[in-house]
Amino acid sequence: MNIRLFKVGLIVISISSCSNKTVQESLLTIDTLLQNKADTLLTTSMIEHQATSGKAIIMETATGYIKAMVGLERKDTLSPFQPTTDFCTPYPTEQRQIATLLAALETGKISLSDTVDVGEGIYISDSDTIKDHNWHRGGYGKITVEWAIAANSRIGEVLIRERAFDDNKSEYEAAIGQIGYGKPDSVKGLDCILNTDVAASKISPIQLITFYNAIANHGRMVQPQLYKDSVAIINPQIASKASIDSVCQTLERTITEGLGKRANTDKTKVAGKGGTIQIGNPDDLTYIMDFCGYFPTNNPRYTILVILEKQGLPASGHIHAAGLFRKIVEQLIQNK
């Protein structure tokens, strides 16, 4: 079969040769109107927050069909935007917290109502100093497991992991793999090999949205698709219904009471979580902000991931990325 590159909007997809462009486009899951809307929203957000890189992916929850996939980058805030098609490279993110919670719940050693003591927001683990975002305000102290995730406590994640898996890193990483965090290994139409670095909290954008989509699907993980093929199942049930329900409850609380309030909208009920990672040296700090979630919560139709990268503060996944997530949700509702 002859395969070539085919451009739709701002993404390039490898596609079988066909007789005409109309036939080619009809094979793809991309919604051209939605692709253009997502591009506009991403561009506006990047200008507003002075971001140098940004990505947005919209996936149909039940099928795994990718309805929009936009990537933009620029050398600095004065340079023009250029499209990027890299949705496969693992990037550092705090989103592993959700995978840690689900894997821990599956052991039966952890429940949402259990408490963890994150103290004053500073914790030493394996010679690494871990700080919560509010460490300079005295930290959270004793909190429930559910609130640790909803409040984006890095220390909370470590304590949850330690309680469920002790110091057995190989057992933890195996448990993370068991629930599908880091799947799939490839996507037809994306010319890349997908990798995940659990130990370094790195995962590719397409793998992260696939994991969240499985949670939205009540544990059913479907293969992300750029072609209108039949739905392909990666795993019919990544975890028990009880554990999935607990994670969904936590993601909903993140929106209503936790750090994800900026993603909330009065047009529908959403669930999701954000994160912020600082990279680079102290003289040239770069921040990677993301937010991933789904809606509506009672019967999810779409799963969305947004990622923004910028130099310097202010930078927050639960503010900047969450705001873009909300705008995409409202655009999808408007398009109905």
Regions found by a protein language model. Give the residues of each.
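Conserved catalytic neighborhood of penicillin-recognizing serine enzymes
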Residues: 62, 110-113, 118-172, 233-245
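Active-site-proximal helix/loop microenvironment
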Residues: 70, 86-95, 183-233
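Mid-domain, small-residue-enriched loop/turn segments at the edges of structured enzyme/sensor domains
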Residues: 127-141, 165-204
